[in-house]
Design a protein with these regions (language model features):
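A short beta-loop-alpha structural element at the N-terminal edge
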Residues: 5-17
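Conserved GNAT-fold acetyl-CoA-binding loop/helix
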Residues: 18-43
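A short helix-loop-beta-strand connector motif used in the catalytic cores of GNAT acetyltransferases and
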Residues: 43-55, 82
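Conserved beta-strand in the GNAT
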Residues: 55, 61-70
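Conserved acetyl-CoA binding element of GNAT-fold acetyltransferases
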Residues: 78-90
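Conserved acetyl-CoA pyrophosphate-binding loop and the N-cap/start of the following alpha-helix
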Residues: 92, 96-104
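Conserved active-site alpha-helix within GNAT-family acetyltransferase domains
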Residues: 99, 123-141, 147
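Conserved GNAT acetyl-CoA-binding A-motif
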Residues: 110-120
Length: 158
């Protein structure tokens, strides 16, 4: 019987992390937006400690990952764990591994005393939305906005 385990990523995993980021972006039909490099991952995750990565392993084979970071809730007066990326290899889906990864992250939130566990999901991704709702997650009436590239530079330099 297969056993799912987890391990924290280390600096030797930057290539694997970037590979999973690209796989997720491809699934989301946004691969052309990925400009991150191994050096970026090394710098922000392992040198500046701005994010953490956990791998899911089936019988010692890495089959998925989660990348997360902290945000702050002024309403709660506490930090939130923000899940940026979650990806399970397609051939391993349907085995409860996505739920197990979310359970692992929820335990981190509880054990570390954080205030909330949050993430975003593309509006077209109905299978994931239905899955999250089945876990008791609530959709909030928020819109996510991004400023990058020229628009960011323009605002910064007006």
């Amino acid at each position: 019987m297969s056993q799912l385990t987890f391990r924290n990523a280390d600096e030797n995993d930057v290539g694997l992390i970037l590979e999973f980021i690209r796989k997720l972006a491809d699934y989301e039909k946004r691969l052309d937006e990925v400009v991150a490099t191994e050096d970026d991952i090394r710098k922000w995750v392992f040198e500046k400690h701005q994010a953490e990565v956990i791998f899911a392993l089936e019988d010692d084979k890495v089959i998925g990952f989660a990348l997360f970071f902290l945000s702050f809730s002024t309403y709660l007066g506490n930090v939130n764990l923000h899940l940026e990326d979650l990806f399970i290899e397609p051939e391993y889906r349907g085995n409860g591994y996505g739920k197990a990864m979310l359970k692992k992250l929820a335990k981190i939130v509880v054990d570390r005393g954080y205030g909330r566990f949050e993430w975003t999901c593309l509006s077209w991704n109905k299978p994931s939305i239905d899955f999250y709702l089945s876990l008791g997650a609530k959709q909030k009436d928020w819109n996510v906005f991004h400023l990058t590239g020229r628009e960011l530079e323009k605002l910064a330099n007006e």
